[in-house]
Amino acid sequence: VNPRQRLRIALAKGRLYQPAVACFGRAGVRLDPDPGRRLLIPSSDPAIDFLTVKPADVAVYVESGAADLGVTGTDILRESEADVLEPLELGFGACRLVAASPAEDPWPERPGGQTARVATKYPRLAWEHFARAGRPVEIITVNGSVEVAPLLGLAHWIVDLVDTGNTLKANGLVERETILTVGAVLIANRASQKLKLDQHLALMRRLEAVAAPQGGGPSPSNPGTTAPVRP
């Protein structure tokens, strides 16, 4: 296959990886089950290769052109503000980004006008949410175990992803506000989509046929990020 016609797709390691592999499999693009130590993973389609990267790096690879396409969550995408196209919701990875606090904690104000400390992996989204509500907060960026931050005195509130809510309850936290509905989306490099439009559209049609629409796709706050699929 002519290298100019090949598609390189970045997949996020972690919670979205297996659902993404399954989604591509249903679309007839199966990853090599035993790639060994190869960084580029071949697939059943000779014109498509995959690479696996950290979730935060998917949009970086796609925006830079190191990958033509990628699969990522709208939480990471909105946090990064990457300049990429979002042509398709993929119908998996549904959850929500929420603000939460201890059940006994006053909400939405702190006693005596105290500035609330908020622990999160999403500092930009958290700050914007509270700024829109006119609530000054101090953002504390952490990379893991966000739910224990109030228990340990690191923060008063948290902003984190929630699926069932069981982890919040186990740590004595109550979901207060939904900030963003999250789901997996296909993202595309702008230049690549122009140069390889036919390949992009062919793959998108295959994925669209097996993807179930859900919330978490392109948002009104990000106009112009959706690439229409040509009929």
Predicted segments with their positions:
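Domain-level signature for soluble enzymes in the chorismate/prephenate branch of the shikimate pathway
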Residues: 1-231
